Regions:
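C-terminal motif of bacterial Sec signal peptides marking the signal peptidase cleavage site
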Residues: 17-20
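Bacterial N-terminal signal peptides that target proteins for export
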Residues: 1-11
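An acidic-aromatic pocket/loop used at catalytic or ligand-binding sites
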Residues: 22-181
């Protein structure tokens, strides 16, 4: 499931980061948690991808309302955007990877990398359920990403450059910003 979620984040410009405890079905549903979305200066809101991600969440979790999600992109370099979010969240710096130089504690922000086509292939069945006919042969190349954990009422942030836009079947050489719980 984490691989599929990560792939969905890459392909749909989102990392369906759906963390949290599930409530028993006998309990009253809780109010959705309000998030303070911090938007990188000059970033553009990607409404089609945000809505597609919400639809994907509804397919994966049909009995739950979609979580608050926002997807943006910017021309700014990945490292510059990562520094902005790490500082705004009060974290020290971005670790080179999730192991944090083999430390026992997972860092609050770290780099990762991946392959666009393998990530798109991993979510192809979900794309078919959503009636999205993306040409996955165009998802070529490697990407760098940064994962930044949530803090208080602030969402988890996933940054990626470049990213594959499944709605247009093209690789976009911009930094994608996904904010989700």
């Amino acid at each position: 499931m984490p691989r599929v979620s990560r792939a969905l984040a890459v392909v749909l410009m989102t990392a369906l980061a759906l963390a949290g405890c599930k409530k028993e079905k006998t309990e009253e549903p809780a109010e959705p948690q309000a998030f303070a979305f911090t938007v990188y200066p000059g970033a553009q809101y990607l409404a089609p991808l945000t809505e597609l991600d919400k639809r994907a969440n509804t397919v994966l979790h049909p009995n739950e309302p979609p979580p608050p999600i926002a997807i943006y992109d910017t021309d700014a370099p990945l490292d510059k955007v990562a520094d902005y979010y790490v500082k705004s969240y009060g974290f020290g710096k971005v670790a080179p990877d999730a192991t944090n130089n083999l430390s026992a504690a997972k860092p609050p922000a770290y780099y990762r990398s991946g392959d666009l086509q393998s990530d798109v292939k991993a979510i192809q069945p979900l794309l078919q359920k959503l009636n999205v006919s993306a040409d996955i042969s165009k998802a070529q190349g490697k990407y760098r990403a940064v994962e930044i954990e949530s803090k208080m009422n602030r969402p988890r942030v996933t940054l990626q450059r470049p990213y594959f836009d499944v709605t247009r079947s093209q690789v976009i050489d911009r930094t994608m910003i996904l904010m989700a719980p």
